[in-house]
Amino acid sequence: MKIITIWNLKGGTGKTTTTFNLAANLAKDNKMLLLDLDMQANLTSFFDIDTKKYKTNKPDISALLADDSLNVSKSIYHSRIDNIDYIKGSNDVMRLHLEDISVLGSRLSEISQEYDICIIDCHPDASILSENALAIADLVLIPINLDGFSRDNLNLVIKEIIDLEAKCGEINFKILVNKLKNLRSQRLVYKDLAENHDYPMLETSVSEYSGIQSALLRHKPLYMHRSKSLVLSLIHI
């Protein structure tokens, strides 16, 4: 099972939207597992309508990480989208006290043969829970918005990754430009990031599109313009 972790220290960069739509695209050819580590559990809210058909409430990610006697397979929900399963998030994750960065990987190893790809939606922080998700990732995808603070944010993000690499080894990460508008100011920021700094930028970007919010309100994925090229970029990394 390949693991893609969606993470940034900054909120509002489109992590959850990226997770949801990337999973919907990849699910055409892969069996997907989504994991919601954000304490706001927004990814879970996209699928919560599906939980009504279950007679019992399954353990969420907080319960699984707090109690290793729980069966991971019995915590999985099947979504309304073919080939996408998920484990529910919970705001209780903020109260978890994990001992090291191997806990999440250990739990996911129990079901690694059942899925092709797992995508993890992280809370925007540098907690040990986020470190767990970063340490086990085959790819860390960092969505950013192009604004005057992009470089400062990326410097903090990369410092955190470098610090974590001292504990877990090399981390493969790429930067995805999200919510792109055709503005001169954004073009200048992108040029600065791509040409003047050694940031691992994905060539593909995701344009801001009014239909995205409408799709999210309906809890439906949006097959965004150029989303296919984003998926192909990830597959070949």
PLM regions and their residue ranges:
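P-loop NTP-binding core
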Residues: M1-I235
